[in-house]
Amino acid sequence: MSTAEQRMDTSEVELPNDNVNEQGNKTPRADQPESSASGARNHGEDEEVTEQVELAAMETEASDSIVDNVPKTPRRAGRPKKLPSTSTAAAESAVTPGKRGRKRKGSESVNTTINSTMNSTLNEPKTPGRKQAKLVAPLLTYDLFAPSIIGDRVLSCGEGEALGHPGRTTTKKPRKVDIFEEEGLKPLQAVAGGVHSAVLTSEGEVYMCGINEKGTVPAEGVEKEGSTDEFAKVKFEEDIEKEGKIVMLAAGASFTAALTDQGSVIAWGNLRNSNGNVDVHPLLHKMQEAPVVIVHQAKRKIVKIAAGENHLVMLDEKGCLLTFGDGEMGQLGRSSRTKTIRSKYMCDESGDHLLVPLRFKHKGKFFDVVAKNVFASGFWTIVHGEDGKYYAFGLNNYAQLGIKVDEADVGQDGQDNRELRVFLPAEAPAFGAERTFVNIEGVQHVVILGSDGKVFAMGKNTDNALGLGNWTGKDDQQHWLYDTIQEIEFDSKIVGVSAKLATSIAWSEDGTAYAWGFDTTGQLGLGLKDEDEKMVSKPEEISSAHLDGYSIIGASISDQHTLIIAKKN
């Protein structure tokens, strides 16, 4: 079974539907959702009309609950003809035709009257205090989110060519990557992708290694469809370099994205879904050949990027949310028709078609939410709104999005018919509105870092993925899943977290790192031997001779390897 299949697979735990956790909440059996949507639609003009109407309707409907089933939207024959109002009909009947030339239409007369009225109104003196002041949120900037502490050393552990150790494909403890110190490169950020690694330097340069699967590692000297176990520089074309200095990276399963200081977003590599490569748009083909601009700063300034397995989430300076890529699991948050999303709604350089409406209904009134932070990982997206609340969409098969799975859809025949995907933004009550969280990551579970340095976790807890140390095995029906956030105990203030499939890592303000979960390839960096128990129930400190005299300032964990940035004491 491939890693991607494991992320969405839920068959390894067979438990009753009505499990009860320590909080007394019923916890659902998390079955794999079907990847198919409500059914294929015929292509053509009818579908285009249907989609446009559907998108328009989406912006005016409340989205505060889980979509129970992928809706089968009936074809619409168009809007009924609008009857003229009494005043308009009267105005049209009063029109007198001119003596010569074509007859004047009633609408022209009405427009003339309206324009005349508007002009006279504009010339009237304005009454003081008539206009209500409009509140405008301050613009966001990339330096609120971009890494700023420069490191001295890059280390890696785990398995594969993405480690960046020439001739060595396995290391159970963090080992320094020689090239950065040999060439005097100062690392600023490291991101671990599914089959690759990327490091951003203080000069805005990007170094990569790993498997070059359809443009995943477009570094110098790497053959097409080849691979490299040594970090090499990515050389960008002149038109890409004009977009500004790179200040932030994000990596998915086999793609990478970069944010520039001018607000442009660049991406390269390939996207996948359950049917294979996602390449329905020319831009997605270009990404496989070389880095390309996917959102241009001249059209929209982006200040933060975050990546899931096969989708990218972007936050612009005005607090608008944009999503890009595959939406099969609902992670784009823009449509419940995940199988028939037109290509222009997956890719658009202006960003106009990538916008996610954050419109909700409360007490009969609609209101819009401005986003102030975004998070993405696995097959989901989470948004922190200016109203203090958190909103989520995407795969929710273990209640990891902070939204309880509706148990009412378990049929009398015992079949689990619950919809485990949230297609449109919905409030995630489990996060509450009292705390500010600065990072959220994970796949089937999520690890959550608060601004106060406290760490929480939620979702699937088999293999003690939440770090609570209370799951005892497959017969444990009480602790295998949590749909409310649980605090993980640490002795010091935590400043960073990273999580992927059943694995997590956290590091403290004093430069110490901790790891927990299920160590499959040595990615936890704890030096576990083949005969050792691979399940690490609670956070354990990471140590290495290559870390002596250094403090950890950043880390990124993936399915098979982990990257670490350290600063000399």
UniProtKB/Swiss-Prot annotation:
Superkingdom, natural source: Eukaryota
Compositional bias of kind Basic and acidic residues: 1-10
Cellular localization per UniProt: Nucleus
Keyword match rRNA-binding: no
Record's compositionally biased regions (Polar residues): 108-124
Bias-annotated ranges (Low complexity): 85-96
Pfam families per UniProt: WD40_RLD
Residues in RCC1 repeats: 263-318, 388-452, 511-568
GO biological process: cell division; embryo development ending in birth or egg hatching; positive regulation of nematode male tail tip morphogenesis; regulation of mitotic cell cycle; regulation of mitotic spindle assembly
Entry-linked SUPFAM superfamilies: RCC1/BLIP-II
Region ranges (Disordered): 1-130
UniProt keyword Repeat, yes or no: yes
Record keywords, A-Z: Cell cycle, Cell division, Guanine-nucleotide releasing factor, Mitosis, Nucleus, Repeat
InterPro entries for the chain: Ran_GTPase-activating, RCC1/BLIP-II, Reg_chr_condens
Reported function: Key component of the Ran GTPase system, which comprises ran-1, ran-2 and ran-3 and is essential in nucleocytoplasmic transport. Promotes the exchange of Ran-bound GDP by GTP and regulates the onset of chromosome condensation in the S phase. Binds to the chromatin. RCC1 (ran-3)/RAN (ran-1) complex (together with other proteins) acts as a component of a signal transmission pathway that detects unreplicated DNA.
Note: Loss of ran-3 causes low levels of chromosomes to misalign on the metaphase plate and segregate incorrectly in early embryonic cell divisions.
Protein name: Regulator of chromosome condensation
Species of provenance: Caenorhabditis elegans
The encoding gene: ran-3
